[in-house]
Design a protein with these regions (language model features):
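Glycine-rich, flexible loop/turn motifs
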Residues: 4-7, 102, 150-151, 209, ...
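Short clusters of hydrophobic/aromatic residues that line enzyme substrate/ligand-binding pockets
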Residues: 8, 155, 322
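Conserved C-terminal alpha-helix-loop-beta "cap" of PLP-dependent enzymes
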Residues: 258-346
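A glycine-/small-polar-enriched, mobile loop at the entrance of the PLP active site in fold-type I
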Residues: 1-21, 26
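Conserved PLP-enzyme active-site core in the AAT-like
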Residues: 25-256, 263
Length: 346
């Protein structure tokens, strides 16, 4: 801690890099590791999380099942309803967790208004920016304090490498908040280090690195870091082509007689069209969902008869992929939770 540097691969190595304009970033073994570390760094036993109901099924299940066993509870909210979001915040709430583009509703939260609510209550706004990626939006310019990525998706882009990234904007004032003594008070694990006093703006990410990453070890391997850094260089070009392909398919589906609905914020009739123009003027990405007329059987028939698309869940691959969220990415959710997430059998 006296001198920064690469002392051990599990903690840091020279083939990991910071992105997105934050003050510091931490690479992890997977996107779910990035989510888990972020939550565990902010919330401890007896604490509370407010989370969007329209998040990835794995994150939803983490918050609903294992974390309550460790004393961390969550209230899931409709992030379109700002009054509901604020009403859910308690004295022991430690973060508001959203996704820039929701998985699988592809909804866009009002980042600036949510940031205003979170900051009013002295807690950070955390956004999983996996589906949007920094090329399409800099979430920090809209009030987000911490960004999370599954680097497996658009950053990796080839379905061969698992990784995650946590990026700290460095803008949240942990000391002024009064709710995060773990970053302010002297701790015994690092010889009476106070993160806010001794490392300043990078207090959060350093705490994650020297506590959670060091002590639990879910580090990104140097080789995977090398692959992700290589592919990051072409991410803008790949995303542009992804978007072109997506728009062509969306146009086809919108006009298909057997399609009930298409969720894609760029569509003029999307409830998120105005937010897309505000927050994602460059483009809204290439992930979309659609509902066929009928039920799960009809949805399965569509998937089974596709020739170009592979039935795989690792979004943003170089291959064209399709998935049935209700039985895969969100398969562990109850019917009530699926409904809240906007995931239907069809």
């Amino acid at each position: 801690m006296r001198k920064p540097g690469n002392i051990y691969t599990r903690i840091t190595n020279p083939t990991t890099a910071a992105i997105e304009g934050g003050v510091e970033a931490l690479a992890t073994a997977s996107g779910m590791t990035a989510v888990t570390y972020t939550i565990l760094a902010l919330a401890h036993a007896g604490d509370h999380v407010v989370a969007a109901s329209t998040i990835y099924g794995g994150t939803f299940n983490l918050l609903k099942e294992p974390l309550p066993r460790y004393g961390i509870t969550t209230t899931f909210v409709d992030v379109d309803n700002l009054e509901e979001v604020e009403a859910a915040i308690k004295d022991n709430t430690k973060l508001v967790l959203i996704e820039t583009l929701g998985n699988s509703l592809i909804n866009i939260p009002d980042l600036e208004k949510l940031a205003e609510i979170a900051h009013k209550h002295q807690i950070p706004l955390v956004s999983d920016n996996t589906f949007a990626i920094p090329y399409l939006i800099n979430v920090f310019s809209h009030g987000v304090d911490i960004a999370i990525h599954s680097a497996t998706k658009f950053i990796g882009g080839h379905g061969t490498t698992i990784g995650g990234i946590i990026v700290d904007s460095g803008r949240f004032d942990w000391m002024a908040s009064g709710k995060f003594p773990q970053f302010v008070d002297e701790g015994s694990s690092c010889h009476n280090l106070s993160y806010t006093r001794d490392v300043g703006a990078v207090a959060f990410i350093i705490a994650v690195r020297v506590q959670l990453l060091r002590d639990t070890g879910a580090a990104l391997s140097p080789f995977n870091a090398f692959l992700l850094l290589q592919r990051l260089e072409t991410s803008s070009l790949r995303v542009e082509r992804h978007v072109q392909n997506a728009e062509t398919i969306v146009d086809f589906l919108v006009n298909h007689p057997k399609v009930e609905k298409v969720n894609y914020p760029k569509l003029a009739d999307s409830p998120y069209h105005a937010l897309a123009e505000k927050y994602l003027p460059k483009d809204v990405g290439s992930i979309f969902t659609f509902h066929v007329k009928g039920g799960e059987e009809e949805a399965r028939k569509v998937i089974d008869h596709l020739e170009i698309f592979s039935d795989l869940a690792n979004a943003a691959d170089a291959k064209s992929l399709v998935v049935h969220p209700a039985t895969t990415t969100h398969g562990q959710l109850s019917e009530k939770d699926l409904e809240a997430a906007g995931v239907t059998p069809n």
